[in-house]
């Protein structure tokens, strides 16, 4: 019996992260029967910070850096990430070898009772400056309250009465079989999702050409192009997880439409921009949308946000 070559996949230990890693594992093994994948769970620095605000501790990169360290130390062959947790640019030693076909990118509202009875001054849980900014436009009288933890933890806090509603990503709920908890889907053109929301990225070392070739069979072209356009917006703006930036791209008939926003956390200022172009020019479209945001006052807004 021929022994199968083992591929080591590193991921976070949350139920959603493990689901994503298992999905990638199955995709690899189905496409390459001579390979066997092993999942290595890692508790990242972001997972260990259960009470502090991410914005005070280094941002979403804290969910990614320990996984990247495992790649660089050659303790793993690939790392599976939620793209929205990753910085706009990869370092020279690492690259995203595959963008898995995107799940539903929308944000959703989960309510403790019924949506129809949600009061105007409801306490809504979110830790995202982007969501806070847009919630203040959607529900001006609402009170935003910080919430941390994985999907299950956040739902438990809602059920325990700490919040009257919370905002989560549709993709995570659907992947975990919790779609029945969703009360309302936000329109992604009005309440713009996070950059890369709903997309899974499989990262490998830049010098591992064998792994890059293997991952090509998993790569979804449309997802890659959409995420490339979205990430280009943030790359040009130089935003981080403290900045209320959002971008969402869709492709139809090889035409890529990109919607983006930049605003203040309190929702009093929201700048929007849209651009349509050939999908193969995804990065150029992203840069153009970012330039439009800057020209509309985004430059001074970013300086103000970084003070």
UniProtKB/Swiss-Prot annotation:
Instruction: Provide the family line.
Output: Belongs to the HMBS family.
Q: Which cofactor does it need?
A: dipyrromethane
Lineage of this protein's species? Bacteria, Pseudomonadati, Pseudomonadota, Gammaproteobacteria, Legionellales
Q: PROSITE patterns given for it?
A: PORPHOBILINOGEN_DEAM (PS00533)
Keyword Transferase applies: yes
* Cellular component GO terms held in the UniProt record: cytoplasm
GO MF, one annotated term: hydroxymethylbilane synthase activity
Q: Which residues carry this modification: S-(dipyrrolylmethanemethyl)cysteine?
A: 241
Keywords on record: Porphyrin biosynthesis, Transferase
Which SUPFAM superfamilies does the UniProt record give? Periplasmic binding protein-like II, Porphobilinogen deaminase (hydroxymethylbilane synthase), C-terminal domain
Q: What's the superkingdom here?
A: Bacteria
Task: Provide the assembly information.
Answer: Monomer.
Catalytic activity, EC: 2.5.1.61
Q: What else is known?
A: The porphobilinogen subunits are added to the dipyrromethane group.
Q: What is the catalytic activity of this protein? A: 4 porphobilinogen + H2O = hydroxymethylbilane + 4 NH4(+)
Protein name (database record): Porphobilinogen deaminase
Task: Tell me the cofactor note.
Answer: Binds 1 dipyrromethane group covalently.
GO BP: any one term: protoporphyrinogen IX biosynthetic process
